Swiss-Prot record:
Residues 568-701 are annotated as: Required for synaptic vesicle accumulation during synaptogenesis. SMART domains: IG, IGc2, TIR. It is a single-pass type I membrane protein. Residues 1-19 form the signal peptide. GO terms for cellular component: cell surface; cytoplasm; plasma membrane. The TIR domain mediates NAD(+) hydrolase (NADase) activity. Self-association of TIR domains is required for NADase activity. One of its GO terms (biological process) is negative regulation of exocytosis. Residues 20-361 are extracellular. Residues 33-133, 146-235, 245-353 form the Ig-like C2-type domain. This is Interleukin-1 receptor accessory protein-like 1-A. Disulfide bonds join C54-C121, C167-C219, C270-C337. It comes from Danio rerio (Zebrafish). GO terms for molecular function: interleukin-1 receptor activity; NAD+ nucleosidase activity, cyclic ADP-ribose generating. The lineage of its organism: Eukaryota, Metazoa, Chordata, Craniata, Vertebrata.
Length: 701
């Protein structure tokens, strides 16, 4: 009875163990109970010792190896020829050196790569049989490392809190009652640990975990001439949160309203932040009203998988997208995004409404864009070629200007003539333009009828009245602003007569101002600006030197635009206007700058004997001028000589100084003969002048 007690105890233990591990039990083969593969795996690096214990004595039966032997049970070891359980097994033959059997375990001193596989221990006698298998993994170190990443243990530490890292599975290498001598490494390197990291017999204690503590920690133990290493990977997380997740978009506290066009595709993305809450996965989902999206019948509406946008120390930002392929009326309404963890739930709402449809939006925008582009192009062309376009229109569709049909001339030409002492010199370019080129082109090429005072003025009354009458007979007033004209204040002629001044101010006559040079350096330039301000109907045209003489230049186009329209009577070739070249200006005569002075001198031919030599000399010079410049008309007056030294009252038109027009006489150094002449005729308004007076008189027309 006493001998049966151990057997009964073993059988009772087996029955209890069977009831406890019924889930893991694989079955019975040949009358032997097979517990398949034990969950505990033995992992070792190549060259390290390892001990594999029979798992039957550590959770499957309530007996140890000694008790099993005492009741006649024997323990046998097998190795599977394959990697899978149930493959052909063969008994292990122990050589007693590198591989040996010791009680309920087998030792490898050391383990080699070919030792990896399944090892089965079988406890049996003639009436009882039980079997279980264990797994052995043998691996080499990683390149340049002291561990293999597949054989690592893992631990987690919270930021700012303490963490203990143990040296696992070294019980078989330490004698009972002894403290193991362990050396710790981080990333296979010896460390100078900070003060908050402590080493004990089999622990590495970190008092305050930091982010830079993440890494591989290796403990090394010397056993029987062999090194035993265990490596643990420490990951650091944020402190365990006690807060519910936070929705980033849409806003939790504000309803997001969206107007969407029917038939269009809609994507709504919800983003949420989850603090570290252990190994619990974040939960985010969409609902419409009280319905989950997956419970809705429409296949057009779906939500994506939860995606991790970013993650740091266990804290995650995740997103989930709600997609509606083709929005319909039934899809309009309120949609809610929910995010929850073990600490609570948050939600954000989106209201989807119908957008007012804009028909042909793209076509309309494209059409408007094309129209605006065309308008901008047309405005640019008009701005750059405005004069050319207006002239072209006027040439093809316009009639001749009927404004001022009762006027005989198209324009009155006001200009400045050159002094007599400059007669033998080459005319300046501006004077040549004003006296030669401008009248010739306007009359011969464009067919305009100009009133040129040197040529067309017939004295009928006073000088100012004649000028006023001639200006009234013209549709335009052309003022050629040469430096000489500005210096002499040529516009004073039009300011002296009130009727002329009123015409300029009121706009009864249109004025064309031709600037022939940069006049800013001229002393009277400020008066020129005041003149421009006082004229109501004013057009300013700039002559830029010889380059403006070409018929196709912008100067002539602007001038034609400001002149009354008249169809041209003849054409000219397109080259620079130069009287030295044959062409339309080959017959151009040089304009005499002293024609009226010539007329005055001729009128004084029979004057006082004392004046006769100088007058005769002046007459000869003026005769030469008339021969050279026969283009202009001169006037001869026969004035009888009076013996008493006085001239009879004779109506004579002459060129007077502006000072005389203002009621003053010029003050200069005169001879006694000139003084006597002035005193004798001081009260005569219109007098013939001496040649010297003629040379310094006004030459403004």
């Amino acid at each position: 009875m006493t001998a049966l007690n151990p057997v009964l105890f073993l059988l009772c233990g087996v029955s209890v163990s069977l009831s406890l591990k019924v889930v893991s039990k694989r079955g019975s083969v040949d009358g032997c109970t097979d517990w398949s593969v034990d969950y505990l795996k033995y992992r070792v690096l190549h060259g390290e010792p390892v001990r594999i214990k029979c798992a039957l004595f550590y959770g499957y039966i309530r007996a140890n190896y000694t008790q099993a032997q005492s009741i006649g049970l024997s323990l046998m070891w097998y190795r599977s020829s394959g990697l899978g359980h149930g493959d052909f097994e063969e008994p292990i033959s122990f050589d007693g050196t590198r591989m040996s059997k010791e009680e309920d375990a087998i030792w490898f001193r050391p383990a080699e790569l070919q030792d990896a596989g399944l090892y089965s221990c079988v406890l049996r006698n003639s009436t009882f049989c039980m079997k279980v298998s264990m797994t052995l993994l043998v691996a080499d170190n990683d390149t340049a490392g002291c561990y293999n990443s597949k054989l690592r243990y893992t631990e987690k530490g919270e930021l700012g809190k303490s963490k203990d890292i143990s040296c696992p599975d070294i019980q078989d290498y330490v004698q009972p009652g002894e403290k193991p001598q362990i050396t710790w490494y981080k990333e296979c390197n010896v460390q100078q640990w900070r003060s908050s990291v402590l080493q004990t017999a089999d622990l590495l204690a970190i008092q305050d975990v930091r982010e830079d503590d993440i890494g591989n920690y290796t403990c090394e133990l010397l056993f029987g001439g062999f090194l035993v290493r265990r490596t643990t990977y420490l990951s650091v997380t944020a402190p365990l949160t006690e807060e519910p997740p936070r929705i980033l978009f849409p806003s939790e506290n504000k309803l997001l309203a969206m107007d969407v066009q029917l038939g269009s595709m809609l994507n709504l993305t919800c983003r949420a932040f989850f603090g570290y809450s252990g190994d619990i996965s974040p939960l985010v989902y969409w609902m419409k009203g009280e319905k989950f999206i997956e419970d809705m019948d429409q296949s057009r509406i779906r939500e994506s998988e939860i995606k991790t946008v970013r993650e740091h120390l266990g804290e995650q930002e995740v997103s989930i997208t709600l997609t509606i392929d083709s929005l319909e009326e039934v899809d309009l309404g309120n949609y809610s995004c929910y995010a929850e963890n073990g600490n609570g739930r948050r939600q954000a709402n989106v209201q989807i409404g119908k957008r007012v449809e804009l028909m042909y939006t793209v076509e309309l925008a494209g059409g408007l864009g094309a129209i605006l582009l065309l308008l901008a192009l047309l405005l640019s062309v008009y701005k750059c070629y405005r004069i050319e376009l207006l002239l072209c229109y006027r040439h093809h569709f316009g009639g001749e200007d009927t404004d001022g049909d009762n006027k005989e001339y198209d324009a009155y030409l006001s200009y400045s003539k050159v002094e007599l002492d400059q007669w033998g010199q080459e005319l300046q370019e501006e004077e040549r333009f004003a006296l030669e080129i401008l009248p010739d082109v306007l009359e011969k090429h464009y067919g305009y009828k100009l009133f040129i005072p040197d040529r067309d003025l017939i004295p009928t009354s006073t000088y100012i009245e004649d000028v006023s009458r001639c200006v009234d007979m013209s549709k335009r007033l052309i003022i050629v602003l040469t430096p000489s004209y500005v210096l002499r204040r040529g516009w004073s002629i039009f300011e002296l007569e009130s009727r002329l001044r009123n015409s300029l101010v009121s706009g009864d006559i249109k004025v064309i101002l031709i600037e022939c040079a940069d006049l800013r350096g001229v002393i009277n330039y400020q008066e020129v600006e005041e003149l421009k301000q006082s004229i109501k109907c004013l057009s300013v045209v700039h002559w830029n030197g010889p380059q403006s003489n070409k018929p196709g230049s912008r100067f002539w186009k602007q001038l034609r635009y400001t002149m009354p329209y008249r169809r041209p009577q003849q054409t000219i070739t397109n080259h620079a206007l130069d009287t030295s070249e044959p062409g339309p200006f080959a017959d151009l005569q040089t304009v005499s700058a002293i024609s009226m002075a010539t007329a005055t001198s001729a009128a004084l031919a029979p004057a006082h004997p004392e004046l006769r030599p100088s007058l005769r000399s002046s007459y000869r010079s003026h005769s030469l001028a008339r021969q050279k410049h026969s283009h202009y008309r001169s006037y001869d007056y026969e004035l009888p000589f009076t013996a008493g030294g006085t001239l009879p009252p004779q109506h004579t038109y002459c060129n007077l100084p502006l000072t005389l027009l203002n009621g003053q006489r010029p003050v200069n150094n005169k001879t006694l003969r000139q003084h006597s002449l002035d005193e004798h005729h001081g009260n005569n308004a219109m007098l013939p002048l001496l040649p010297r007076e003629t040379s310094i008189s006004s030459v403004i027309w």
